[in-house]
Amino acid sequence: DDEKEIEERFYCDLVFGTAGLRGIIGAGTNRMNIYVVRKATQGLANYIIKAGKQDKGVAIAYDSRRMSPEFSMEAALCLAANGIKAYRFESLRPTPELSFAVRYLDCVAGINVTASHNPPEYNGYKVYWEDGAQITPPHDQGIMAEVKAITDFADTKTMDMVEAKKKGLLVTIGSEVDDAYMGELKKLILNQDAIDKYGKDLKIVYTPLHGTGNIPVRRILKEIGFENVYVVPEQELPDGEFPTVEYPNPEAKEAFTLALKLAKEVDADLVLATDPDADRLGCYAKDSKTGEYKVFTGNMSGSLLCEYEVSQMKEKNGSLPADGAIVKTIVTTNMVDAIAKYYGTDLIECFTGFKNIGREILRFEQTGKGTYLFGFEESYGCLIGTHARDKDAVVATMALCEAAAYYRGQGKTLWDAMMDMYEKYGYYVDDIKTVTLKGVEGSKKIGHIMNILRANVPEQVAGYKTKVVRDYRLEYIRNIETGEVKPTGFPNANVLYYELENDAWLAVRPSGTEPKIKFYYGIKGSSYDEAQKESAAFGDKVMDLIYDILEK
């Protein structure tokens, strides 16, 4: 009878955005429930039929969250009722395997029921297109328009499950796709001999954080020769309540509490955690000098994997492909730029969101120009290989363990290898500050910050001189010293990026999905400790600048 609660649940529709749906599970048009899922699927079906691709099926996966199996079945039966074959996994699977399945089964699209690392009351629905990447223009806008056009739930179709199976419109998938996916991962191993030699001695602690990673991660590690894998027992089994963590996010230190406790008990070399849909990976490794476990940021683990993969590809093949490319998002560490320069590969930048990295792979395939070597973003997601077109923490776990075996052969831990990289390329430290400004007022304030920064380019940021400003909304790049102006060559987006002296930078970006504005930044210091201090001071000064703007 709570009127406020009723209003909250029905005052608007849960918006189907560029990333699909994400919301709190419950009754109401502003919640995640079978009706909202059916409406989204009907919109997708209408788009597929209008594109004339209804003869190709749709792959469907889901994670360990509340209602995930039910929502995925609802989506499958809606597609079946529209005459589109649904290939639904028999049980929970990681996001990257869904991305793989879309292409493996020659589907037109994929649906993944997941809310990644959100709190337990949330669930979500992500759509993939036939290349296996999350939808990008023009498909995202086209599908959104079709979903929006459905104004009555009576216009959505569904079908009896038994009938759908009898008609061959609902097909259950499982071990065949699993085996094919595992086979693709094994092809990406660069140093099986290092695993054979040192993998047995390596002690690895792993937690799937109650999600989808447990079976595939343990399977791949076991099959390639890692015998000492200790799984955190309290977090091993899928559980949509995520009872042992406040927030099942491998970026959060708290998510590692139980894993680090186990690591100390078994004297592990490496501590790994995948998020509930197993597309992002967090990592700790032992510092051989002090014996303590050190945390890797997403930028650090991504850079380490990038260096390992590219250096070993070169060693194995004698050289790298002439058109070899490393892909990163614009807010990812500049250490990658230094790696690309050192190995003479192309460096391609794109906007945040892994679908944009997936889009670059598609461009390489369509044009025949560009060989994908490695891609990653700062938010703990990377992709080795092109079997999937989304972040893949299963392959990243495999590769990090392989790298740990390789460096062990040189008497080093992964942390030691990271320190060597800093010596080689410079002490790059990157971080992010987020300011939350809720409601209509908050939205105005975020707009105000962007307008002020856009109209008055700061001569310096945190004491670093501004060299180049990139305005992705006004679509220009301006060199402050020479006055030269050129186009960004990027799609339009409300993002500002300042290239500063000494390889420092700042990027400002309002979140597309939350009432937040994000400030990503990076500096390059002369030692590890000094760079950490410098980065902290830089972040404080950026916040001072922003609060000054808000007070005006």
Which residues does each predicted region cover?
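Glycine-rich phosphate-binding loop plus the immediately following alpha-helix
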Residues: 128-158, 299-324, 328-339, 393, ...
